[in-house]
């Protein structure tokens, strides 16, 4: 509910913003002749000033107006720099609207969005679930490959979030990341597998959509979650229901046997009834085995049936296609009424529904016949709907209802919509061919239409009559004569061509009319359409072969006209006919068979439904609508002959609960101990477990929550009750962890220790009944109290030690390490004496954390001599400029990178006043230029220094290098390795800092190279050549460490190269500046891999 309420509040905010935007637009009054064109510019400047204001109310008003502009489709991209500054605002309402804006424009303004990536990372830990989800949406909207590792880690973290709304957005981000980098597929499948186990209805639809996009072939991931998805289906949001139903349809076709076998078996039995072979009887007996539907198959059909009443047309259509594809034929009929109900929706929904009904009506006429009148055409229907309804009526036509339908069609022919009228005539022709009883009636009705005033109706009637006459040509000579008279009045090319073809095919039956028609056509040959010209040529050839005396000269005249026609098809057909019907010395053997070729009996055309071949596409899909396979279409598989093992869908609920709530699956040891508690404590425990189960879907990583992360997360939540509950859970988890690691004691000792630990935990907060029960099995009350006190101290010390070890372990696994921004925090433990060993250890840790004096900037290990071209002498008209990075601290500022530029005069004249101007720097970047050079002698050279603050990014610094006469546009783009300063530190400090920079602050990759490339000298030379880093002494021969800090922010950059077995090594980079770390990793990997 919380996720839904946040979603609705976000939509409500958008609506309010739209209203405010409209009010703001209406108040802008144009001033002067150009007010209409300057109002937008003035309004945007006003918004920028409001966003830079110190008042939150002004910023909030500005953001509402901006979001309103976006809602109305206006371009607000130029406000991106001003909006992104407020991404770290403390006002939650402003922050929400800023994230709404960033999701829209992050992909367009990638460079500016990358500058705020650290803010997005911090927002992933925000106490507000909407902010965490919005930060993930923005992060996944930045379509830059270098942040793929960051997105991957953020998705993993969000998939274990306590909020189902955040987990839902994690599922959405999976699809975006997969489209950006398909190589992450295996890691994303792990997250999908985890989210599929989620019990929240808010997450189910989104994760199934991610499953369909990333790994639709991994059916094994669905087995254990099949029944859960079926049971959750009714409560999932509407669009999630659509996705899940389509996926389960495909799943059912692979896991269950066909429910249609029973009907097929009956048909076979009817055939075998008349056969007397003994072998055939044995086969018949085998087929008589009754079909038993799988319970899981029945579960799916039963749970989707209520969704036929859904208000969402897509859900109803999804259920309908599911019933059509996987349910027994006797049960499909229940979808008819729901589909007919959808015909009251808008025209777009009607179009899709009618297309699917048209496909169904071909195979199951009886299912839709009771609703025949629902498909009658209305005058208000658009043409596309009318034609689809005609198609359905044609498919449903039979001897019983054809008279009613023909009266309906007679009305449709008179429609003002000519396209619809023509389609109706085609429908009448199809009815005439499929129902022999009304063939003559339809033909006579079509002949009457030949005298219609509308030329399109007459032309379509001619085409349909031509097809009907092909079936019974000998009986309709009078109709052909009547159609020949229409040649003078019909101008539609298709109709004229059809009449000529009919006369040509029946030229022997109308021997007096055919030559005269050819004479008329020869007069107008040059003005006819190409389709008509082809039929004139065919008519001439047929008459030449049957009535050569009357038509020989006329045919030769037509052939001469066709020989010089502009269309090459006409010329080609003319040459072909001439060689075939006019024999000469070069004529081949085919001339003898010309009459058989031209006057052969043609088969009658088949008037079929255009939806006949669409049944192999899944109903309701884009491929079915287009009648062609669309990109991303997943085909339905054939039913398996033998059902796969159904036990793969069995889920052992008890074992899952034990694994989810205990550190090492010790449920069997916990249950006996619980029996010693009083009834009141059992009630409290059950209430705690029930309250915790509400967030069970979010705590997929149970061990991390039990080892302390849940207490840190919950400390940021506004609910104090939730915080206390999670702390108590973490305390119990810590005690169980300490108990689990004390392996030196025997089984009975460990059980006694467990009882006393539980007693010491509950003695302060609950009644003394439980302690008295435990004391009855031991000695006196005083002895038990002293023993419990000493044991509690001992266990507390062991627990403190184990907690610190567990924290070091979880830092390697955790995705979002909160220690990056906070000092080392003490774990949550039971009350202990003031000077406990754990406190002393924590104080020592705090003292060690202030080690800034130990880490200091060092001199560079290596300075490459490689120079970069700043200005070529040809482009600079004789002035050439090169630059390189001396890897020294900049004298112009601590945050600037030092750059030395060498200027050369390659001309034979003096170049004067060399200076820099026209700086075009990205936001936040600064430049300290060199002093102007008065003159540079011919063939002279000079080296100058300058400093640029690149803001820890590899963005290009653009400026103009000018002389007295010219200005040249130049750029400096720093390699990522030159944005660092080498640092000297000990191995101990390196490991400590590295331990604090884990999770999202760590990127790694595997390197494969020849063994000779992994020697210490080669690795050192390659690393320091790419990056300005210092060498950290290492006590291990297979690990090489390098350290540096970024010039602008001073963030540590720790590089580790760890040699593995064989010819592989692991490259690890730890830094808060994750973008720079990813770029450095990408540059170091090919260098270390190559020989």
Curated annotation (Swiss-Prot):
Pfam families in the record: Adaptin_N (PF01602), AP3B1_C (PF14796), AP3B1_C_2 (PF24080), SEEEED (PF14797)
Composition-biased stretches (Basic and acidic residues): 267-288, 667-678, 719-736, 790-807
Region span, Disordered: 1-32, 267-290, 664-807
Stretches with biased composition (Low complexity): 763-775
Modified residue annotations for Phosphoserine: 276, 609, 748, 750
Stretches with biased composition (Acidic residues): 679-695, 703-718, 776-789
GO cellular component, one term: axon cytoplasm
Membrane association type: Peripheral membrane protein
Post-translation changes: Phosphorylated on serine residues. Pyrophosphorylation by 5-diphosphoinositol pentakisphosphate (5-IP7) impairs interaction with KIF3A. Serine pyrophosphorylation is achieved by Mg(2+)-dependent, but enzyme independent transfer of a beta-phosphate from a inositol pyrophosphate to a pre-phosphorylated serine residue.
UniProt keyword list: Cytoplasmic vesicle, Golgi apparatus, Membrane, Phosphoprotein, Protein transport, Transport
InterPro entries per the UniProt record, alphabetical: AP3_beta, AP3B1/2_C, AP3B1_Ser, AP3B_C, AP_beta, ARM-like, ARM-type_fold, B-adaptin_app_sub_C
Protein origin, superkingdom: Eukaryota
Subcellular location: Cytoplasmic vesicle, Clathrin-coated vesicle membrane; Golgi apparatus
Any one of the GO BP annotations: anterograde axonal transport
Quaternary structure and interacting proteins, as annotated: Adaptor protein complex 3 (AP-3) is a heterotetramer composed of two large adaptins (delta-type subunit AP3D1 and beta-type subunit AP3B1 or AP3B2), a medium adaptin (mu-type subunit AP3M1 or AP3M2) and a small adaptin (sigma-type subunit APS1 or AP3S2). AP-3 associates with the BLOC-1 complex. Interacts with KIF3A; interaction is direct; interaction is impaired by pyrophosphorylation of AP3B1.
Its job: Subunit of non-clathrin- and clathrin-associated adaptor protein complex 3 (AP-3) that plays a role in protein sorting in the late-Golgi/trans-Golgi network (TGN) and/or endosomes. The AP complexes mediate both the recruitment of clathrin to membranes and the recognition of sorting signals within the cytosolic tails of transmembrane cargo molecules. AP-3 appears to be involved in the sorting of a subset of transmembrane proteins targeted to lysosomes and lysosome-related organelles.
Entry similarity comment: Belongs to the adaptor complexes large subunit family.
Protein name: AP-3 complex subunit beta-1
């Amino acid at each position: 509910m919380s996720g839904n309420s946040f979603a609705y509040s976000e939509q409500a905010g958008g609506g309010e913003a739209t209203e405010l935007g409209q009010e703001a637009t209406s108040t802008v009054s144009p001033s002067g002749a150009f007010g209409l064109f300057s109002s937008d510019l003035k309004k945007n400047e006003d918004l920028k000033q409001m966003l830079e204001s110190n008042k939150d109310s002004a910023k909030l008003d500005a953001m509402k107006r901006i979001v309103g502009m976006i809602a109305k489709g206006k371009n607000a991209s130029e406000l991106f720099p001003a909006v992104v500054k407020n991404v770290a605002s403390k006002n939650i309402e402003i922050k929400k609207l800023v994230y709404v804006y960033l999701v829209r424009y992050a992909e367009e303004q990638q460079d500016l969005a990358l500058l705020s990536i650290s803010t997005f990372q911090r927002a992933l830990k925000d106490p507000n679930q909407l902010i965490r989800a919005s930060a993930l949406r923005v992060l996944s909207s930045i379509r830059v490959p270098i942040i793929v590792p960051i997105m991957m880690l953020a998705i993993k973290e969000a998939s274990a979030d306590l909020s189902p709304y955040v987990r839902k957005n994690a599922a959405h981000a999976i699809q975006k990341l997969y489209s950006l980098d398909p190589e992450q597929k295996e890691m994303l499948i792990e997250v999908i597998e985890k989210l599929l186990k989620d019990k929240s209805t808010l997450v189910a639809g989104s994760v199934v959509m991610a499953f369909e996009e990333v790994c639709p072939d991994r059916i094994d991931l669905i087995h254990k979650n099949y029944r859960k998805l079926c049971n959750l289906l009714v409560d999932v949001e509407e669009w999630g229901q659509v996705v899940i139903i389509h996926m389960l349809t495909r799943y059912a076709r692979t896991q269950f046997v066909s429910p249609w076998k029973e009907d097929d078996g009956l048909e076979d039995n009817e055939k075998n009834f008349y056969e007397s072979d003994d072998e055939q009887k044995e086969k018949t007996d085998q087929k008589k085995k009754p079909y038993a539907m799988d319970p899981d198959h029945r579960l799916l059909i039963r749970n989707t049936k209520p969704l036929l009443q859904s208000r969402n047309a897509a859900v109803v259509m999804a259920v309908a296609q599911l019933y059509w594809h996987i349910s027994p034929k006797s049960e499909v009929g229940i979808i008819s009424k729901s589909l007919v109900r959808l015909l009251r929706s808008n025209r777009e929904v009607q179009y899709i529904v009618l297309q699917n009904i048209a496909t169904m009506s071909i195979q199951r006429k009886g299912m839709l016949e009771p609703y025949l009148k629902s498909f009658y055409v209305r005058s208000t229907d658009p043409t596309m709907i009318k034609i689809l309804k005609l198609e359905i009526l044609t498919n449903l036509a039979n001897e019983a209802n054809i008279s009613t339908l023909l009266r309906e069609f007679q009305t449709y022919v008179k429609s003002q919509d000519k396209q619809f009228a023509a389609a109706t005539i085609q429908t009448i022709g199809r009815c005439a061919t499929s129902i022999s009883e009304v063939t003559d009636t339809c033909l006579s009705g079509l002949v009457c239409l030949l005298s219609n005033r509308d030329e399109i109706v007459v032309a379509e009637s001619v085409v349909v009559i031509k097809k009907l006459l092909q079936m019974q040509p000998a009986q309709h000579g009078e109709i052909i004569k009547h159609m020949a008279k229409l040649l003078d009045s019909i101008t539609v090319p298709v109709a004229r061509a059809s009449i000529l073809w009919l006369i040509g095919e029946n030229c022997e039956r109308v021997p007096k009319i055919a030559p005269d028609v050819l004479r008329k056509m020869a007069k107008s040959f040059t003005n006819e359409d190409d389709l008509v010209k082809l039929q004139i040529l065919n008519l001439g050839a047929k008459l030449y072969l049957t009535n050569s005396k009357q038509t020989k000269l006329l045919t030769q005249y037509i052939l001469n006209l066709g020989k010089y026609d502009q269309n090459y098809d006409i010329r080609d057909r003319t040459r072909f006919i001439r060689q075939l019907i006019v024999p000469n010395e070069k004529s081949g053997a085919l001339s003898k068979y010309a009459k058989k070729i031209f006057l052969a009996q043609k088969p009658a055309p088949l008037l079929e439904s255009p939806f006949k071949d669409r049944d192999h596409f899944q109903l309701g899909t884009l491929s079915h609508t287009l009648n062609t396979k669309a990109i991303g279409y997943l085909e339905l598989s054939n039913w398996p002959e033998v059902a796969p093992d159904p036990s793969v869908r069995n889920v052992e609920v008890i074992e899952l609960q034990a694994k989810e709530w205990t550190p090492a699956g010790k449920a069997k040891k916990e249950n006996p101990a619980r029996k010693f508690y009083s009834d009141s404590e059992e009630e409290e425990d059950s209430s705690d477990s029930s309250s915790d189960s509400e967030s069970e879907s979010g705590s997929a990583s149970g061990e991390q929550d039990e080892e302390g992360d849940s207490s840190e997360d919950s400390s940021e939540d506004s609910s104090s009750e939730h915080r206390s509950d999670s702390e108590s859970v973490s305390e119990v988890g810590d005690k169980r962890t300490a108990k689990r690691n004390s392996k030196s004691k025997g089984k009975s000792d460990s059980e006694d220790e467990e009882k006393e630990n539980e007693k010491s935990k509950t003695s302060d907060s609950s009644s003394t009944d439980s302690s008295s029960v435990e004391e009855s099995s031991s000695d006196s009350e005083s002895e038990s109290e002293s023993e419990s006190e000493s044991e509690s101290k001992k266990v507390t010390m062991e627990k403190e030690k184990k907690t610190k070890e567990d924290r070091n372990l979880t830092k390697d696994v955790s995705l979002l390490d909160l220690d990056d921004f906070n000092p080392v925090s003490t774990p949550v433990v039971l009350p202990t004496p003031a000077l406990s060993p754990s406190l002393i250890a924590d104080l020592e840790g705090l003292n060690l954390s202030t080690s800034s004096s130990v880490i200091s900037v060092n001199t560079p290990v290596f300075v490459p001599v490689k120079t970069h071209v700043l200005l070529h002498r040809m482009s600079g008209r004789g002035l050439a400029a090169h630059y390189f990075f001396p890897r020294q601290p900049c004298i112009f500022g601590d945050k600037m990178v030092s750059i030395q530029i060498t200027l050369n005069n390659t001309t034979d004249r003096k170049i004067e006043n060399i200076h820099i101007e026209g700086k075009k720097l990205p936001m936040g970047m600064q430049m300290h230029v060199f002093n102007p050079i008065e003159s540079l002698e011919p063939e002279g050279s000079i080296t100058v220094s300058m400093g640029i603050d690149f803001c820890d990014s590899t963005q290009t610094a653009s400026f103009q290098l000018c002389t007295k006469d010219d200005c040249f546009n130049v750029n400096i783009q720093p390699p990522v390795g030159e944005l660092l300063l080498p640092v000297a530190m000990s191995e101990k400090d390196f490991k400590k800092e590295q331990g604090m920079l884990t999770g999202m602050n760590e990127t790694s990759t595997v390197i494969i190279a020849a063994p000779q490339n992994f020697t210490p000298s080669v690795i050192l030379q390659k690393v320091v050549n790419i990056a300005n880093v210092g060498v950290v002494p290492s006590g291990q021969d297979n690990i090489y460490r390098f350290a540096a800090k970024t010039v602008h922010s001073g963030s540590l950059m720790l590089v580790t190269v760890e040699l593995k077995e064989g010819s592989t090594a692991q490259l690890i980079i730890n830094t808060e500046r994750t973008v720079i770390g990813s770029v450095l990793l990408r540059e170091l990997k090919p260098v270390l891999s190559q020989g």
